[in-house]
Regions:
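Conserved acidic segment of CheY-like receiver
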Residues: 9-23, 28-32, 45, 60, ...
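Acidic catalytic/metal-coordinating carboxylates
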Residues: 43-44, 70-76, 94
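C-terminal output helix
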Residues: 95-97, 111, 115-124, 174
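Receiver (REC) domain active-site loop signature in two-component systems and cognate sites
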Residues: 66
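Short amphipathic alpha-helix used as the core "switch/output" element in two-component signaling
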Residues: 50, 72-84, 101
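Basic, Lys/Arg-enriched C-terminal extension of HTH/homeodomain DNA-binding domains
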Residues: 187-218
Length: 218
């Protein structure tokens, strides 16, 4: 196994194996254990979803053809719960159209049974890189929301106007306040957002979901 697979992001997260075939679960758990990757097997999608609230973020290896609740239904349930962990789907040989359907629903990759250890670990390596990026983006959004929550109403109005591309003079006119007052609110806004530049402040605003102000009528 390449060193970058064994020592990279794979060792930092868990793999959740969802397959109704006990032999497949055992085989995959053995393979992942040999690669020093934490694995957690589930015999059904229902079992996984029941345990989901207590699980740490990880990669999901999902069989599409299962009784009671198939892989597509599991993916729908994850979307409803706003869980965006990377999903790799397992398909039978020649079931590429089925895999394509799964990828349209959000799966990041697919493997055909029987699959090689090298191919599967390669999929995991890419999936965990994606998970790391998503987690970082989530942290940035949360931090942006926390900082934006510190803004006063007037400071947020100034920020929304800046997002709309207005100058300080235009903001003063649209809000009916003096230019000096706009500059004061803008400075306070920058301090509360801990932004060192206007570009950084606007990026934080967008990550916090703040919408640009509407253009003044007339």
């Amino acid at each position: 196994m390449p060193a970058n697979l064994k020592d990279g992001p794979l060792k930092q997260h868990s793999v959740y194996v969802i397959d109704d075939d006990r032999d497949v679960r055992r085989s995959l758990s053995f393979m992942l254990s040999a690669a020093e990757i934490r694995s957690h097997p589930f015999g059904s999608g229902l079992d996984f979803l029941e345990a989901l609230p207590d699980l740490e973020p990880g990669c999901i290896l999902l069989d599409l053809r299962m009784p009671q609740m198939d892989g597509f239904e599991v993916m729908d349930a994850l979307a409803e719960r706003k869980v965006d962990w990377p999903v790799i789907v397992m398909t039978g040989h020649g079931e590429v159209p089925v895999a394509v359907r799964a990828m349209k629903l959000g799966a990041v990759d697919f493997v055909e049974k029987p699959f090689s250890e090298q191919a599967l670990l390669g999929c995991f390596n890419q999936a965990f890189g994606l998970l790391k990026d998503r987690e970082a983006a989530g942290r940035r959004r949360r931090e942006a929301h926390e900082r934006a929550a510190l803004l006063t109403g007037r400071e947020k109005e100034v920020l929304r106007s800046l997002l709309a591309g207005q100058s300080n003079k235009e903001i003063a006119q649209s809000l009916g306040i003096s230019l000096r007052t706009v500059e004061m609110h803008r400075g306070n806004m920058m301090d509360r957002l801990q932004a060192s530049s206007l570009a950084e402040a606007l990026t934080l605003a967008l990550e916090a979901g703040i919408e640009p102000a509407q253009a003044p009528a007339g």
